[in-house]
């Protein structure tokens, strides 16, 4: 990622980290793309997408993150082709909204005994994979055929379950980036949507 943006992170919002940059290094955005940034956080991925794509929708379950993304887009003069919404994954979108590219740097750590105010941005379920599995299932309803889905996963989570969810929902999946960290390995998975199987009556 070579772009530089004027950028602030509000307290209580996930700050861009190694996983954010790993995702941004893996994605390819075309000028004709309609992009959905799920879990937009402070909005760095939304800024990158807005500077390249035809249309961007940015969503986050956290109102604070929605505010943060909106402020950063305004600060960089990138509001004209972006909508920012508070939404729990796809629930706030029109049921027929379709995208050529969807990206998500999800909470991917398994649950532990420690509870913090940032758990919503870090914990992806008991095994760390449950939220990502739900995301992949729901994403298939919002993708055009051959649309690309990018998601960050951790070796600490149940990555086999995530890969199985991709294939069960008609995605052709591959690993496109990875980085070993101190206690885990993070990867970016890319799924290309092949369309729902036709039911023959």
Question: Could you describe each region identified by the protein language model?
Answer:
Residues 1-29:
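Class I SAM-dependent transferase core
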Residues 18-96, 101-112:
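Conserved SAM/SAH cofactor-binding pocket of Class I
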Residues 3-5, 77-82, 171:
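A short helix-to-beta-strand connector/capping loop
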Residues 195-201:
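Flexible, glycine-/basic-rich loop-and-beta segments that form/coincide
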């Amino acid at each position: 990622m070579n772009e530089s943006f004027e950028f602030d992170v509000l307290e209580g919002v996930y700050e861009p980290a190694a996983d954010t940059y790993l995702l941004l290094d893996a994605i390819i955005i075309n000028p004709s793309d309609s992009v959905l940034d799920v879990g937009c956080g402070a909005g760095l991925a939304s800024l990158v997408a807005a500077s390249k794509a035809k249309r961007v929708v940015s969503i986050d379950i956290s109102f604070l993150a929605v505010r943060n993304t909106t402020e950063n887009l305004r600060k960089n003069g990138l509001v004209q082709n972006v909508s920012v919404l508070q939404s729990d994954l796809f629930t706030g979108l029109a049921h027929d909204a379709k995208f050529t590219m969807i990206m998500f740097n999800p909470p991917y750590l398994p649950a532990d005994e420690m509870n913090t105010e940032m758990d919503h941005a870090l914990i992806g379920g008991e095994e760390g994979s449950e939220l990502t599995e739900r995301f992949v299932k729901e994403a298939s309803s919002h993708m055009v055929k051959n649309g690309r889905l990018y998601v960050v996963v951790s070796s600490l989570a149940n990555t086999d379950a995530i890969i199985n969810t991709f294939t069960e929902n008609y995605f052709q999946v591959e690993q496109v980036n990875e980085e070993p960290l101190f206690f885990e390995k993070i990867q970016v998975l890319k799924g290309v949507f092949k369309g729902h199987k036709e039911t023959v009556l």
